[in-house]
Regions:
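Internal intein/HINT superfamily modules and their associated LAGLIDADG
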Residues: 1-141
Length: 141
């Protein structure tokens, strides 16, 4: 797109690229009118190739935009007193079934165990799965 201006902005841990053009919808067909969870989100063939080759980077982008990594604290009352258990987990939330499907497919390619904790939330809570996802996602800056 020779007529659109592009600029790069250095940020901690990444470089943010900005560009404004009315032709982005031609290159990225999933962008369109209406809410994303009310229309079909479908990757173009060239995007599918990239997502298949780089599922870790794709998952990182998804979790950095619509996900979080936190620590759950669970309280149990036992005969010998109260016990607290803590464990790390990831959650990814999105109203679009298509985006949730794409996220799940990327996690499957990475060998990360996941499940739906709600209709619109993907949960990664098993210790090994969280450790595996940590290799790709990392902290938000």
């Amino acid at each position: 797109m020779p007529t659109s201006s592009v600029c790069g902005v250095k940020q901690t841990g990444c470089t943010m690229i900005k560009s404004y053009s009315k032709h982005w919808a031609c290159l990225f067909p999933q962008h369109g009118p209406g809410r994303k969870h009310q229309r079909k989100i479908e990757l173009a063939p060239w995007q599918e190739v990239i997502v298949r080759e780089y599922p870790g980077e794709f998952a990182r982008g998804l979790f950095h935009s619509d996900g979080w990594r936190g620590v759950n604290r669970v309280h149990r009352r036992l005969a010998d007193g109260d016990h607290w258990y803590e464990y790390s987990r990831y959650q990814f939330s999105n109203k679009s079934a298509d985006i949730l499907r794409l996220c799940g497919e990327a996690l499957d390619r990475l060998g990360v165990a996941w499940r739906f904790s709600r209709r619109d939330v993907i949960s990664v809570a098993r210790r090994g799965a969280v450790a595996r996802l940590d290799e790709f996602v990392g902290p938000k800056y």
